[in-house]
């Protein structure tokens, strides 16, 4: 495989630092990925050489910023193969995107007695907004169960759908197990029953090409900071026909057509009616640079490289006798495990002393922890800049902990 890993690693400045006297092994990209120099430079350039407020500015700096921001909207649409740039809404992240759909689409189209389907593997961001909506409106939440291998029980979906079911919210890739759900087939089954489908792509867009039109989903959400972009910027894709029917969730500047103290307010068309206030313009620029970066490398080569590395990692980790691996054999991005009876926090703390960064805890997936009957897990996540040497360091660290703690 000719993936240019040495060049890629050189593009990420933070990877060259040491932690606790050891060269850093960063295995926490599923929480937040490191940033290539191109993204850092793009934000710096905007702040240093081109900063201005967008919306309604007639001076050159403002006009340039508006043009650049809207160019990124088009770039995002191309990246996920949306039909139009007007189907792309800038938000703070995946969490805000889901809350926007729950509070705009949900409160406008759902009513007491309706039902929503979520899955047992969802991140809290794709659970809690629906629970809040259900509590307020009297909507029922139905849970799509998992198999013992951490995959959706595909045959169970049909039994969850009836005449009251309106919406399915499902992750494309589990943030804990790495399970890659067959989204196209799931969406087809849901749409045949008349459901609206939201797909959480937060753990997918950095690992594989995404085509929202081919998937057929109504909404697709993801965050920039997991895609090697800045924090505080994310994307909500929505089919234009739906967005134009949805009321705004937040009010303020930039999302209006007219405001009158006597006649009330009229709202801008989508997507702008969902972008109240001053946007994170620098973050938008940085997201554009991040998309440029992964596009230049190619998502298919990235996917092939990461899958090869994942197979190697699973093979090496499976040799540690006291280690329990969670999730299916075929997965993307993440490896969840526990070492013997040791608490995940203890394992993570020891690894940190060895310069190895992983994530520990419930990973914003308490229902999944309950499914496996554990309070927490360790999670190592792989990105385009990780190597077999990183995996070997992790394995050696775990073997060292196994000897120390027994």
UniProtKB/Swiss-Prot annotation:
One cellular-component annotation, GO: cytoplasm
Residue numbers carrying N6-(pyridoxal phosphate)lysine: 226
GO BP term (any one): cysteine metabolic process
Localization of this protein: Cytoplasm
Cofactor(s) listed: pyridoxal 5'-phosphate
Enzyme Commission designation: 2.8.1.7, 4.4.1.16
Catalytic activity, as annotated: (sulfur carrier)-H + L-cysteine = (sulfur carrier)-SH + L-alanine; L-selenocysteine + AH2 = hydrogenselenide + L-alanine + A + H(+)
UniProt keyword list: Cytoplasm, Lyase, Pyridoxal phosphate, Transferase
Keyword Transport in record: no
UniProt-listed SUPFAM superfamilies: PLP-dependent transferases
Record bears the keyword Nucleotide-binding: no
Known function: Cysteine desulfurases mobilize the sulfur from L-cysteine to yield L-alanine, an essential step in sulfur metabolism for biosynthesis of a variety of sulfur-containing biomolecules. Component of the suf operon, which is activated and required under specific conditions such as oxidative stress and iron limitation. Acts as a potent selenocysteine lyase in vitro, that mobilizes selenium from L-selenocysteine. Selenocysteine lyase activity is however unsure in vivo.
Similarity comment: family membership: Belongs to the class-V pyridoxal-phosphate-dependent aminotransferase family. Csd subfamily.
Subunit structure: Homodimer. Interacts with SufE and the SufBCD complex composed of SufB, SufC and SufD. The interaction with SufE is required to mediate the direct transfer of the sulfur atom from the S-sulfanylcysteine.
Name this polypeptide is given: Cysteine desulfurase
Taxonomic source organism: Yersinia pestis bv. Antiqua (strain Angola)
Phylogenetic placement of the source organism: Bacteria, Pseudomonadati, Pseudomonadota, Gammaproteobacteria, Enterobacterales
């Amino acid at each position: 495989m000719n993936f240019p890993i040495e060049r890629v690693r050189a593009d990420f400045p933070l990877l060259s630092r040491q932690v606790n006297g050891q060269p850093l092994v960063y295995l926490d990209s599923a929480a937040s990925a490191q940033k290539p120099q191109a993204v850092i430079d793009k934000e710096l350039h905007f702040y240093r050489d081109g900063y201005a407020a967008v919306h309604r500015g007639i001076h050159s700096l403002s006009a340039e910023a508006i043009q650049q921001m809207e160019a990124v909207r088009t770039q995002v649409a191309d990246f996920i193969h949306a039909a139009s740039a007007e189907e792309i809404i800038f938000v703070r992240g995946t969490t805000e995107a889901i809350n926007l759909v729950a509070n705009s689409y949900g409160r406008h189209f759902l009513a007491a007695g309706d039902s929503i389907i979520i899955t047992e593997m969802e991140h809290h961001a794709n659970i809690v907004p629906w629970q809040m909506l259900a509590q307020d409106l009297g909507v029922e939440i139905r849970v799509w169960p998992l198999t013992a291998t951490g995959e959706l029980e595909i045959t169970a979906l049909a039994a969850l759908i009836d005449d009251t079911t309106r919406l399915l919210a499902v992750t494309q890739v589990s943030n804990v197990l790495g399970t890659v759900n067959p989204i196209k087939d799931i969406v087809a089954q849901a749409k045949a029953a008349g459901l609206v489908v939201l797909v959480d792509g937060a753990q997918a867009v950095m690992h594989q090409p995404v085509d929202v039109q081919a998937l057929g989903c109504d909404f697709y959400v993801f965050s920039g900071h997991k895609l090697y972009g800045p924090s505080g910027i994310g994307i909500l894709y929505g089919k234009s026909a739906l967005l134009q029917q949805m009321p705004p969730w937040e009010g303020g500047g930039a999302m209006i057509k007219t405001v009158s103290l006597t006649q009330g307010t009229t709202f801008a068309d989508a997507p702008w009616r969902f972008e109240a206030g001053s946007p994170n313009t620098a973050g938008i620029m940085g997201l554009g640079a991040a998309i440029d970066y992964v596009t230049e490398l190619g998502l298919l080569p990235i996917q092939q490289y990461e899958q090869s590395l994942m197979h190697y990692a699973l093979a090496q980790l499976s040799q540690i006798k006291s280690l329990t691996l969670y999730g299916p054999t075929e997965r993307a991005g993440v490896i969840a495990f526990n070492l013997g009876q040791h608490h995940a926090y203890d394992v993570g703390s020891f690894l940190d002393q060895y310069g190895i960064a992983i994530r520990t805890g419930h990973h914003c997936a308490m229902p999944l922890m309950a499914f496996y009957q554990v309070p927490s897990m360790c999670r190592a996540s792989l990105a385009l800049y990780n190597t077999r040497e990183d995996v070997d360091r992790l394995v050696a660290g775990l073997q060292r902990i196994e000897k120390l703690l027994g």
